[in-house]
A protein has these predicted regions:
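Extended substrate/RNA-proximal surfaces in nucleic-acid metabolism proteins
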Residues: 44, 49-182, 238
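A generic hydrophobic-helix recognition signal that picks specific residues
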Residues: 1-3, 35, 67, 131, ...
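Charged catalytic cores and adjacent phosphate/nucleic-acid-binding surfaces used
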Residues: 1-12, 21-23, 85-97, 143-145, ...
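Residue-level marker for buried hydrophobic side chains located in beta-strands
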Residues: 3-5, 39, 71, 135, ...
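A short, flexible N-terminal coil/short beta segment enriched in small residues
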Residues: 32-51, 221
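Alpha-helical scaffold segments that flank or form the walls of functional sites
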Residues: 22-39, 59-63
Length: 255
């Protein structure tokens, strides 16, 4: 079990993570948790995140500790029609990212369950086929706010997702070398996901693994107490039968 990794971590710089997630604090906690290799992957969703990304990039080289660190970024969908994401090759060149993670983050105004599934599948395929993307983030994650609105209350398991979607995603991942993320925070500890959903999700991960897909694992922590969720993601992959040699890790950044 690869509980030495955490490849999706947010910081207090961008603002989606709280004040506990300063770089010094989160790096110290990762050391305490026994992590060996982590990735800092804060959001770049638009111009408002350029300055915080610059601040992270300037601060990271001051770390002088045992952790191997990869400088990365998380993108979301910029255009649901084309599948374009918010991070471009120009951003990668400007900031020197060594790891780009991306994927859908919603239902994109759809209300019909089958339409929500269809658009998310289409956007996941577009993300995986984007040449700058290294890992598809938290497949089939939806905000808990959608349950509060009543738009995702039907999503108690994965029975509506066609088997063909698994086949198509696996084929695209293997063809492009893009990994699928196992996310402790967004999936395992999601406030609205049922045990039945998580059982189905384990079968989903196992099916992708059987077809040769590789995986990254992470906490997706926005609070320092949730950095431990990467261990839960590692255990989930192990329980799904994913061998360690199908768990991917990006190159370590040389600052």
């Amino acid at each position: 079990m690869r509980d030495d990794l955490d490849l999706h971590i947010h910081t207090s710089h961008v603002g989606c993570a709280n004040e506990t997630m300063s770089l010094p604090a989160l790096l110290a906690r990762c050391e305490q948790l026994g992590r060996k290799h982590i990735a800092i992957t804060d959001h770049l969703n638009g111009p408002q995140h350029i300055e915080p990304q610059s601040a992270i990039h300037e601060e990271l080289p001051s770390y002088d500790g045992p952790l191997s660190i990869t400088w990365g970024v998380e993108a979301t969908i910029a255009d649901a029609e084309s599948g374009a994401i918010t991070v471009t090759a120009e951003h990668v060149g400007r900031f020197g990212y060594d790891f780009v993670i991306a994927g859908p983050h919603g239902r994109y105004e759809e209300t019909d369950p089958d339409a929500i599934i269809a658009i998310n599948h289409r956007l996941m395929l577009a993300t995986v086929r984007n040449p700058i993307v290294d890992s598809l983030v938290h497949p089939w994650w939806f905000s808990r706010l959608e349950w509060d609105r009543g738009t995702m209350t039907w999503f108690e398991d994965m029975s509506r997702i066609p088997d063909s979607h698994v086949e198509e995603l696996a084929e695209a991942c293997v063809e492009t070398g893009t990994s699928v993320e196992m996310n402790g925070g967004a999936i395992i500890h999601h406030a609205r996901y049922t045990d039945r959903f998580k059982d189905d999700y384990m079968e989903y991960i196992a099916a992708l693994s059987e077809r040769g897909v590789t995986f990254t694992l992470c906490s997706d922590a926005h609070d320092i107490e949730k950095l431990s969720y990467a261990t839960d993601a590692a255990q989930f992959l192990a329980d799904a039968g994913v061998p360690d040699d199908q768990i991917a890790a990006p190159a370590v950044t040389e600052f």
